Regions:
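C-terminal motif of bacterial Sec signal peptides marking the signal peptidase cleavage site
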Residues: 15-18
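Long, low-complexity, Ser/Pro/Thr- and often acidic/Gln-rich intrinsically disordered regions
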Residues: 12, 25-26
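Bacterial signal peptide processing site
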Residues: 20-22
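Bacterial N-terminal signal peptides that target proteins for export
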Residues: 1-8
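Acidic (Asp/Glu)-rich catalytic clusters
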Residues: 145-151, 164-182, 236
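Structural detector of well-ordered beta-strand residues that form the stable sheet scaffold
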Residues: 156-158, 181, 241-244
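N-terminal pro-sequences and low-complexity stem/linker regions of secreted or lumenal proteins
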Residues: 88, 92-94, 145, 156-162
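C-terminal active-site subregion of NodB/CE4 polysaccharide deacetylases
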Residues: 31-132, 137-140, 168-171, 175, ...
Length: 278
């Protein structure tokens, strides 16, 4: 694994500047090249967003079935030379998928709401689903909420905090009813780092989000879904109440809360339909 710069230094830079480091996939130059082609679409989307009230509704009841958790990475079309083009879902596909979910009676909730139902006598809608986004790319904070707000839905952003979205974008997501959780400081393979670095990746990323957003940060997202017993134990010790993987399946009250499954969406509507029918 490529050695990381000093995490202590990285965290100081994070606190002072609010950005730094590099994304886990694709180059900065490649992403910059695609920015102009997508800016007009996402600017229009931003203008249409309405504030969402994501709190439980009177019609919600205790729910004991399986809850699907989806995970999206980047939205839009992959630019030429992108290292991981399969992680992109086009804007049209994303809109079609959200429309289909709504037509099927699904209602998006946050991980906090799901966990409250599972373990604290909370409530959920009749057909709940959790829609998560990993890493913290700009379209996840602009285009995705514009589409999801049509249905009054919140999302969940798992943020890499050293190379994070600017604070105003994160705060705006929270104002829309979104949940923002930790995806580590720098997205390393946590099974390959020292115990000290593991603790920094977990604790400092959580503290940063809590300090900036003034909200609970209860969930952790394992970078690249890499974990072992030591990593899971460290996640618990850092104060998280649950963690998400990229293993497919439905979350239930009987699922290990630190190994919550998610369906990774990398294609069109047919893939989503097949996942939810499994």
């Amino acid at each position: 694994m490529r050695p990381l710069p000093s995490l202590a230094l990285l965290f100081v830079v994070l606190l002072l500047t609010g950005c730094g480091g590099s994304r886990p996939s694709g180059s900065t130059n490649t992403r910059s090249a695609s920015k102009s082609r997508r800016s007009a679409v996402h600017a229009k989307a931003r203008a249409s967003v309405k504030v969402t009230n994501a709190s439980p509704q009177p019609s919600w009841r205790r729910y004991t079935g399986g809850v699907p958790i989806l995970v999206y990475h980047d939205l839009g079309n992959p630019p030429p030379g992108q290292d991981y083009p399969g992680l992109y879902v086009s804007d049209a596909d994303f809109e079609a998928e959200m429309a289909w979910l709504h037509q099927q009676g699904y209602q998006a909730v946050t991980l906090n709401e799901m966990m409250d139902d599972f373990f604290h006598a909370g409530t959920l809608p009749a057909k709940p689903i959790v829609i998560t986004f990993d890493n913290g790319y700009v379209p996840q904070a602009t285009f995705a909420p514009a589409v999801m707000s049509k249905y009054g839905w919140p999302g969940v952003l798992n943020e890499i905090t050293v190379d994070h979205l600017n604070n105003n974008r994160l705060k705006r997501l929270v104002s829309l009813g979104w949940e923002v959780d930790s995806h580590s400081l720098t997205h390393p393979d946590l099974t390959q780092v020292s115990a000290a670095e593991l603790q920094q990746q977990l604790v400092q990323s959580r503290r940063f989000l809590q300090r900036v957003l003034h909200v609970p940060v209860n969930s952790f997202c394992y970078p690249s879904s890499r974990y072992d017993t030591a990593v899971v134990a460290a996640v618990k010790a850092a104060g998280y109440t649950n963690a998400v993987t990229e293993h497919p399946g439905f979350a239930t009250p009987h699922t290990d809360p630190y190994l919550l499954p998610r369906f990774e969406i990398e294609g069109g509507l047919g893939e989503l339909q097949a996942d939810l029918a499994s």
